[in-house]
Amino acid sequence: MPRRRVAAKREVLDDPKYGSQILAKFMNHVMESGKKAVAERIVYGALEKVKERKNSDPLEIFEKALDAIAPLVEVKSRRVGGATYQVPVEVRPSRRNALAMRWLVDFARKRGEKSMALRLAGELMDAAEGKGAAVKKREDVHRMAEANKAFSHYRF
């Protein structure tokens, strides 16, 4: 246990273009090696591509994609008398968003398009339509939780 007080949560400032706090947080997930300007260029470029292809509000599609990716339950390992059980637990709202953003960025990086902005745009549009690798990951996590429902009485 730490001897000090728990550090206060810092507020993330809204992003300058769309005024969205969740988009600003997403940019921090895209950012590598502290290069925020590069991350902004990638995210705004991806949202422009989405706007071009879908002819609708890109922020709306972004939020729809995050909802499609965010998991409701996950499994955590719990050791009971020499055996390790995968115990399904509900995901806190803040963790839901964090996982959704992380998966979105990870699977966008693995795509085959030329630039990161194109990859991110592709993954966003796929996720908003309920397909894509990030949505598959969510379904896999839900399937694992469903399969281990019998161990849910080992709550944390």
From Swiss-Prot:
HAMAP family: Ribosomal_uS7_B
Known role: One of the primary rRNA binding proteins, it binds directly to 16S rRNA where it nucleates assembly of the head domain of the 30S subunit. Is located at the subunit interface close to the decoding center, probably blocks exit of the E-site tRNA.
Chain's gene name: rpsG
GO molecular function: rRNA binding; structural constituent of ribosome; tRNA binding
GO BP annotations, alphabetical order: translation
Descriptive protein name: Small ribosomal subunit protein uS7
Keyword annotations of the record: Ribonucleoprotein, Ribosomal protein, RNA-binding, rRNA-binding, tRNA-binding
Subunit description: Part of the 30S ribosomal subunit. Contacts proteins S9 and S11.
Family in the record: Belongs to the universal ribosomal protein uS7 family.
GO CC term, one of those recorded: small ribosomal subunit
Alphabetical list of SUPFAM superfamilies matching this protein: Ribosomal protein S7
Organism: Pseudomonas syringae pv. tomato (strain ATCC BAA-871 / DC3000)
PANTHER family according to UniProt: RIBOSOMAL PROTEIN S7
